[in-house]
Design a protein with these regions (language model features):
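Sec-dependent signal peptide recognition
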Residues: 2-7
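N-terminal regions of proteins, emphasizing targeting and processing segments when present
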Residues: 9-11
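N-terminal signal peptide c-region/cleavage motif recognized by signal peptidases
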Residues: 13-15
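Phosphate/dinucleotide-binding and metal-coordinating scaffold of catalytic cores
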Residues: 18-264
Length: 264
């Protein structure tokens, strides 16, 4: 496995800077690659791609003291485009709250795991570049989703396999981001530009421009979806709404082989 550009190494070791208000959870305070093992019926997960039904699994890692930690979890497929078009779908990890206190995964429940679309080197690079896109945004605004890069060994309980570690990354849950800033996740149909915090909107719009991303809307969702397309809205009372972007796999910066620019 190799990194796409040298700057990623610096970002991996740089500490996350944050004030007491807005400090990320333990999982996202460290940028070192976390080695984990995920065990479960992976054949079912990949072939059937259940979005409504979970399969049981186990996540294991070694903590800072050298102790092995195992956490029971449920796993299901998720996503839209990548769910339909990738050999391996992105997944949602559902941890058991009673097992996480005192572990690196304290305060975590449901976590999005971004995996390689297929096993090619090019798609491995795409995962790393998308992770890097999140980290770049973290560097310019605390109001962004934190991420943690993993080296994952997958153990399939339905088939004997020799699995080499593969890169993936976890994304902070929107409820945890909201709690960091005393805001609420707004589940609304649509919004307007004038309702959004102007500085945050300008910053994230410039960011999307710089990474060559056209797959987003901060004011509306897809047909039949709540607001917004690849943005999450946060707010409280009469304060301006904060629009926070995610999903950068369609950007020119990531350069995934399946990416297509929005013709509009």
């Amino acid at each position: 496995m190799r990194f796409p550009i040298l700057v990623l190494g610096a970002l991996l070791t740089a500490p996350v800077t944050a004030q007491d208000i807005g400090a990320p959870d333990p999982l996202f305070r460290d940028n070192a690659v976390l080695d984990v093992t995920i065990t479960g019926p992976l054949t079912t997960l990949v072939r059937e791609r259940p979005k409504d039904d979970y399969v049981d699994g186990v996540l294991a890692y070694t903590d800072a003291d050298g102790n092995g930690v195992e956490l029971d979890l449920e796993i299901r497929a998720r996503g839209h485009f990548r769910h339909a078009n990738c050999d391996i779908p992105p997944v949602l990890l559902n941890l058991k709250r009673k097992q996480t206190p005192g572990t690196l995964f304290e305060n975590q429940n449901k976590l999005k795991l971004v995996v390689q679309c297929d096993r090619s080197n090019r798609l491995e690079q795409a995962v790393l570049k998308e992770y890097l896109a999140y980290r770049i945004l973290n560097a310019v605004t605390d109001k962004s989703f934190r991420v943690r890069l993993l080296s994952v060994t997958y153990i399939n309980t339905e088939k004997q396999n020799d699995s080499e570690p593969r890169y993936a990354f976890l994304i902070e849950h929107k409820n945890r981001l909201a709690e960091r800033f005393g805001l609420e996740d707004l589940e609304i149909e649509k919004t307007s530009v004038k309702s959004l915090d102007g500085a945050q909107l300008n910053l994230t719009s410039i960011f999307n421009f710089l990474v060559g991303n056209t797959d987003f809307s901060p004011v509306a969702g897809r047909p039949d979806d709540e607001c917004c397309h690849n943005y999450v809205l946060f707010g409280k009372n009469e304060t301006p709404q904060w629009a926070v972007p995610y999903d950068f796999d369609q950007s020119g910066f990531v350069d995934a082989p399946y990416a297509e620019a929005n013709p509009r």
